């Protein structure tokens, strides 16, 4: 691989943690990665880890050579869906089961039923297998990629490593500028997580940006090119049909999907049905050869609150359901993309209809944004909707950064977007009762109650920022064991007071409730001794 500027990426463990591996039984050489948080109590807490070898101090990172291939990979034996239907627990399924703390048979069954997907192109051996499905932890995707205006290969590789460091489960390369093929090659060869694309973007570049010049042959060849490189899943806007385009005419924001608008322009120019729709069977055959997963695009998603849940959006969703059945008949894995901009009271309906019309294929949503009024804060407006839709059953959330609607995200924006969406995903998992979700909350809450500040930092999603905020006012090392922070100070800390009550109870052989009553009685006597006065004179 060649690049104009050699990429430089962030490496080394996350603060308070180390990289550990568990050997995978039955797959020689395979090791399942975890982020181990070392607690001051002498215990440890292992977390799901997406950062690849970049947080392993013993790993040799050579971006030009790329990451090593994973052990146990078997090529040319069909798709994960076909093998799951045949009753086989693949090496990827076994890896995922160990990673998720779930039975391997559950992984196989969910894939066989089409309710989960394992994006793992035969030609992308560098990835650590992962699963997207509502029975498992909610995943987060981070979009990166250059534009015609800005960015470089080096910057995009750095963003990929940075996003996975903070928890991105997949990456989408949405490059639309120069060197699309080369940028994607660098990302694929160095990505420990699945990589998705939108092939229509590169196809459009090949016809100099004129949608009317697109053909099925140009698109097909672009898809094959990307399959050969190792792209794991592809967004295909095959549900944008000619007859649906007029349904968007009265919308406030029309068609906001880039892929959707490209296909709508082609349909109107030729007054013919979309070549993605009419050639879908052939597309399935190509995907099946490489085990590429469909991410059926919502090209008519609402781009404003006013357009949410309208006729155009749901007409396309019904068509995506039809295409899901066709893809599965070819043994191809499928997930469904969703909105967009949706007010909170309309969010759950999207999940209900997607599951009904699309045979419970994993739902993958962009937010949704719960309001349109906060440019520069859309990582927050969308995380609100993302948490609600995750609780309702969405399997993967596509992050939104503070730069949404404003510009191309930089490194800081990528981290802010990932963290916001890890919060939303985890909140959704807690609400839907994911079996392992609350363990981390309990560990952090216990550390907080016991004033184990360093443990609180290490268990958090962003240890660096948590420590930075604490140290702005209490930077000294003894403050890391103090029983207060700068918010309440030493006398008004509710947790310190609660601990005092418990200490009182232990000292006097009482339970906490008795201790509270005894302490209140003491204060009552003290009040009487001061003449039942609410206000006492100031001490001289």
UniProtKB/Swiss-Prot annotation:
Record's keyword annotation contains Magnesium: no
GO biological process terms on file: thiamine biosynthetic process; thiamine diphosphate biosynthetic process
Entry binding sites for [4Fe-4S] cluster: 485, 488, 493
Family matches, as NCBIfam families: PRK09284.1, PRK13352.1, thiC
EC supergroup of this enzyme: lyase
Pfam families the record matches: ThiC-associated, ThiC_Rad_SAM
Protein name (record): Phosphomethylpyrimidine synthase
Keywords recorded for this protein, A-Z: 4Fe-4S, Iron, Iron-sulfur, Lyase, Metal-binding, S-adenosyl-L-methionine, Thiamine biosynthesis, Zinc
Sites where the protein binds substrate: 143, 172, 201, 237, 257-259, 298-301, 337, 364
Cofactor: binding comment: Binds 1 [4Fe-4S] cluster per subunit. The cluster is coordinated with 3 cysteines and an exchangeable S-adenosyl-L-methionine.
Cofactors, names only: [4Fe-4S] cluster
InterPro entries named in the record: ThiC, ThiC-associated_dom, ThiC/Bza_core_dom, ThiC/BzaA/B
GO MF, any single term: carbon-carbon lyase activity
Entry's family note: Belongs to the ThiC family.
Role according to the record: Catalyzes the synthesis of the hydroxymethylpyrimidine phosphate (HMP-P) moiety of thiamine from aminoimidazole ribotide (AIR) in a radical S-adenosyl-L-methionine (SAM)-dependent reaction.
Positions in coiled-coil regions: none
Gene of this entry: thiC
Catalytic activity, as annotated: 5-amino-1-(5-phospho-beta-D-ribosyl)imidazole + S-adenosyl-L-methionine = 4-amino-2-methyl-5-(phosphooxymethyl)pyrimidine + CO + 5'-deoxyadenosine + formate + L-methionine + 3 H(+)
Record: residues binding Zn(2+): 341, 405
């Amino acid at each position: 691989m060649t690049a104009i500027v050699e990429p430089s990426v962030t490496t080394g463990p996350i603060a308070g943690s180390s990289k550990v591996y568990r050997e995978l039984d039955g797959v020689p050489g395979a090791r399942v990665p975890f982020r181990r948080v070392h607690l001051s109590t002498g215990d440890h807490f292992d977390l799901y880890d997406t950062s690849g070898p970049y947080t392993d101090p013993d790993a040799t990172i050579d971006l030009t050579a790329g990451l090593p291939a994973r052990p146990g990979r078997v090529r040319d034996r069909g798709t994960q869906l076909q093998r799951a239907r045949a009753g086989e627990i693949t090496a990827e399924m076994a890896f995922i089961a160990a990673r998720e703390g779930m039975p391997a048979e559950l992984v196989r069954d969910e894939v066989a039923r089409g309710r989960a997907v394992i994006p793992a192109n035969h030609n992308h051996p560098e990835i650590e297998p992962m699963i997207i499905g509502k029975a498992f932890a909610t995943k987060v995707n981070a979009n990166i990629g250059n534009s015609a205006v800005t960015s470089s290969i080096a910057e995009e590789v750095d963003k990929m490593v940075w996003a996975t460091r903070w928890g991105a489960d997949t990456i989408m390369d949405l490059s639309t500028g120069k060197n699309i093929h080369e940028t994607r090659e660098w990302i694929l060869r160095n990505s420990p997580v699945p990589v998705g694309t939108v092939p229509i973007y590169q196809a459009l570049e090949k016809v100099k940006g004129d949608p009317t010049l697109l053909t099925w042959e140009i698109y097909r060849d672009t898809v094959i090119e990307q399959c050969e490189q190792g792209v794991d899943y592809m967004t295909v806007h095959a549900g944008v049909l000619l007859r649906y385009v007029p349904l968007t005419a009265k919308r406030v924001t029309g068609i906001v999907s880039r892929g959707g608008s490209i296909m709508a322009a082609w349909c109107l120019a030729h007054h013919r049905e979309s070549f993605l729709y009419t050639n879908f069977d052939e597309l399935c055959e190509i995907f099946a050869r490489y085990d590429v997963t469909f991410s059926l695009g919502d090209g008519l998603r609402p781009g404003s609150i006013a357009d949410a849940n309208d006729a155009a959006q749901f007409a396309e969703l019904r068509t995506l359901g039809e295409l899901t059945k066709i893809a599965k008949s070819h043994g191809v894995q499928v997930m469904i993309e969703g909105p967009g901009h949706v007010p909170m009271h309309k969010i759950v309906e999207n999940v209900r209809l997607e599951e009904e019309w699309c045979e419970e294929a994993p739902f993958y949503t962009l937010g949704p944004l719960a309001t349109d009024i906060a440019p520069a804060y859309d990582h927050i407006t969308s995380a609100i909707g993302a948490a609600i839709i995750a609780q309702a059953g969405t399997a993967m959330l596509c992050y939104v950064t503070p730069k949404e609607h404003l510009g191309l995200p930089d490194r800081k924006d990528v981290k802010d977007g990932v963290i916001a969406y890890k919060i939303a995903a985890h909140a959704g998992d807690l609400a839907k009762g994911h079996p392992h979700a609350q363990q981390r909350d309990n560990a952090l809450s216990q550390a907080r109650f016991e004033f184990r500040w360093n443990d609180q930092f290490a268990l958090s999603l962003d240890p660096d920022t948590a420590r930075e905020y604490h140290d702005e006012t209490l930077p000294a090392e003894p403050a890391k064991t103090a029983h207060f922070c700068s918010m309440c100070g030493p006398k008004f800390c509710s947790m310190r007071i609660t601990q005092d009550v418990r200490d009182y109870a232990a000292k006097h052989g009482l339970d906490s409730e008795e201790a509270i009553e005894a302490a209140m009685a003491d204060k009552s006597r003290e009040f009487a001794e001061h003449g039942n006065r609410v206000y006492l004179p100031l001490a001289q």
